[in-house]
Amino acid sequence: MNELIDGPKCASEGIVNAMTSIPVKISFLIIATVIFLSFYFARLAILALLRNNIFSNSTQRILLVCLVNSVFHQAATLEIRIHQVYRSFVYASDPCSLLFHFTECEVELYFYYLTNYFSTYSVFSLTFDRLISHYNPRFYFSQQNFVSNTLLIIQCLLSFGTYYVGLYGVPPFGYVSICYYTPKYAVNFLKINDFRTVVMVFCIIVIIFVYYLSVRSEKQIQRTSYSPGERYWAYENVETSQSVCILIVLQFACILMSSYGVNYIRSKESMMSEEDFHTLAPFFAGVTYASLCLPLVIYFKTKLTIRNRRIRIAVMTSMYGDVGDHMNRLKKSWE
């Protein structure tokens, strides 16, 4: 009776060959390398946000929370992959001990999917943070804690809601070869992937529009205003919107590769051998790659922005002596 509900306990020859193959072990090395690099750059990015922050306080807070979440997600992914590789060595000749029962994966699934969804919906928080900043800057800069806290709460609700739809109440039956694979009786994952994609596409459209408006506004301010504060705010707004735009596009590309890459090879499962399918699937860990992109963009964008600021200051002081003289010249040229 249990076998009818759970499915076969013993791995088929194709799954055994795939899980003990060199390509799957290479995929583990690639994923482990990406994860350790993400740990290293997450530390650098957190230090950059705390010591040399180039973002608004609201954006900074959202990015810090997302970085901490990415560390938890990477740790969960690493633990799952180590567990899988360990079994592939120890039980290579015992197919009935190679697979994981759903009950063995419950804790890993909880952390993996919650942090996965939280990472996905970070695009929502970052997009609306920029949107509010552009359309209501006075409210935004006076209520930054309220804005960031509200957006993070919505992000959490979206993550828990998606987890509830996908995994809550799923019967604890079935076997999988890697613990983050979709449980046997979880039937809503295709709908979840579609919903996540819609959210991300919507956010990409909105943030590109906000970035366009920020660039246009900054050019107008550079032409019509000689207020250092106003010009500085416009420049910083463009830089932040550009960084968020890059983050969202990279996040979308990585998650699209994961969600639809796996769905695509599943749709072709009947056309390929079971061994080929289980050999290819471990490479499609999109959120793992996205969790490396996040600290990379924050860290290198911070360094680039600081360098550009120094260059601008050096040009101003070398050409016009001091900032006061420079602003007087600008004022005369605009009169």
UniProtKB/Swiss-Prot annotation:
Compartments annotated for it: namely:
Membrane
Q: Which GO terms describe its biological process?
A: sensory perception of chemical stimulus
Q: Which UniProt keywords apply?
A: Membrane, Transmembrane, Transmembrane helix
Classify the protein's membrane topology as the record does: Multi-pass membrane protein
* CC annotations in GO: membrane
Highest taxon above the source species:
Eukaryota
**InterPro entries referenced in this protein's UniProt entry, alphabetically:** 7TM_GPCR_serpentine_rcpt_Sra
Q: Where are the transmembrane segments?
A: 22-42, 151-171, 195-215, 245-265, 280-300
UniProt-recorded Gene Ontology molecular function terms: G protein-coupled receptor activity
Pfam families reported in the protein's UniProt record: 7TM_GPCR_Sra (PF02117)
Q: Which family does it belong to?
A: Belongs to the nematode receptor-like protein sra family.
| Protein name, UniProt field | Serpentine receptor class alpha-25
Query: Which source organism?
Result: Caenorhabditis elegans
